[in-house]
Amino acid sequence: MYKSQAKYFEDRVLPVKLCYLGNTFINVSKYYQGRLKENTMLGAELINDNSLAADYEIISMVIDCMLSAGLTEFQVELGNVAFFNGLLHKAGITGDSAEELLRLIKDKNYFGVEELLDSLNIDDTVAKALLELPQLFGGTEVLEKAKSLTDEEECIQAVNRLEELYELLKNNNYDKYISFDLGDLSEHAYYTGILFHAYTFGTGEPVVNGGRYDKLLGQFGCDKASIGFSITIDRLIAALNRQNIHIPHDANGTLLVYNADRLGDAINVSKKLRSTGVNVCMIEYKDSKSDSQYIEYAKESSLVNVAFIDDEYASDSVSYTH
């Protein structure tokens, strides 16, 4: 997908905004590598914009999506991989050691982090900051704590970005959905800045994953900063079901019930209704079913009208039951 984007938008000067819906295959767990599961993913991307406003637009969109789905109790957890990367650069940790450290911090394995750091010859101040990472989660106090751990410029800029983003979210009443986790890292090396996940009750995995990947498209010849997210629809539906959330939606449409010998008339009526913007569902009338059963069927299908076409009605005349 990113290779196609890089080629198609290579010459674009202004930002590009995309959305997508499709099925993907993913490894469901690190314990079952190679065991793929199909998930439906809905997502959005903002390409060629590395601004704070772009970060805000994407995060606020995530919150709006969760609210629109009917969720009220959820958290969007924000981090910034640049903080971790800055500590790695200052300590000179690379290769397998860097990968192992990332994994341990991501898993909140405090003692594993401590053991690994003890085996490395690095500055005590940097080691202390890295050891704190698995515990750097919570409210805005986390950001103050993070800034007190290091004077590394890359790390300070990473925290400043989170603070500025939070202020924008707070000014627009999104702050109650926000928490922070500077130890929430990703095994995907292409993330370069803001990283986020959205969690709610009823699912053990994040419903939303996303972040900033400013150098990913550059690997395909299109050096454009990007940020985006994906909603795992399967997890979202599971959470809604387990929280007993039923989303009301605007019912619009007609159930067209016709006798077998009036199929042609029913088709003509459906064409006329559809031409006016009405959704139409056609079904053949069976003597074994009562009118009330068809009306109930329409209600279950979120159709507001039932039209019976039989010998009593001409092809351009229908009877509606609300």
Task: Identify the residue ranges that each predicted region occupies.
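Single conserved hydrophobic/aromatic residue that forms the stacking wall/gate
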Residues: 1-2, 322
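Positively charged, Gly/Ser-enriched RNA/tRNA-binding surfaces
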Residues: 4-12, 16-71, 117-319
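Short, conserved phosphate-binding/catalytic loop or strand-edge motifs used
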Residues: 37-42, 78-86
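Hydrophobic mid-domain F-helix/FG-region of cytochrome P450s
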Residues: 61-68, 82-90
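Short, surface-exposed recognition loops or helix-turn segments adjacent to catalytic cores
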Residues: 73-84, 101, 179-184
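Short acidic alpha-helix initiation/capping motifs at coil-to-helix transition points
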Residues: 76-79, 105-110, 157
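Acidic, His- and aromatic-enriched active-site or binding-groove loops in soluble protein domains
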Residues: 93-112
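Glycine/aspartate-rich loop-and-adjacent alpha/beta segment that forms the canonical ThDP
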Residues: 106, 319-320
